[in-house]
Amino acid sequence: CRERLKEFDDLARMCITSPPYYGLRNYGDEENQIGIEQTPEDYVWELVKVFREVKNNLTEDGTLWLNIGDSYYNYRPGKGQGLVKQSVSKTNQDLPSKCNRRGNKLQGYKEKDLIGIPWLLAFALRKDGWYLRQDIIWSKPNPMPESVRDRCTKSHEYIFLFSKNQNYYFDVDAIKEPTVDGRGLKRKKSVWSVNTKPYKDAHFAVFPEELIKPCILAGSEEGDLILDPFMGSGTTAVAAKSLNRDYIGCELNHDYGLSLIHISEPTRPTPI
């Protein structure tokens, strides 16, 4: 996606995306895919490089809305059971040898540690020049069940709001919510309750449209261009089109419905 981003000619008003989670699954392209790095730090660094290109493709008042999940360290020497366990989705064991899932012990991590990938990435992006403006909690009323018995079931993920510059576009009125008595509107708070939704061709839940729409409404105006460098099943494109925005993005995985379609015309693309 880094190379593809360099080819884009138009500036997006905002980027909203959910990158491949660390150690989740194999997309079949070991050379280009993200998420199979040997260490969490390597994974974060690859994403930092992607979002450098994203910044170059944003207007000066543009924003980045980033959803990212976490992982647990799972050291099992000699058993080949893997390095991390996802708390947000089912893991796919068919991962290439490039990914450090063979029980190689990493410095600084203890077995059962929550790695803290969302915040590792957030701080790395801030250090790279992004303004870290807010952490939004995606609360999941229907989280994936977990068999673990020594902690609570994980039922949230983060959405981070970054801005390219100190002053940026944010329409607070566009996402106001009804008051309890229904007589007025109030500002949207930072905990969003949205159900997960499965994707028919994947073994895990994907970015829900109801989670994306408030981000688009707050971060752009009608007719603006929305960027997603990890388009996945195309939910960002669907949400953008429904809100009269244009969209552009790319996707490596052939299994998704977009199947390597790169949307490159900022003029009301055909429905997917």
Sequence positions of predicted segments:
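Core catalytic lobe of class I
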Residues: C1-S259
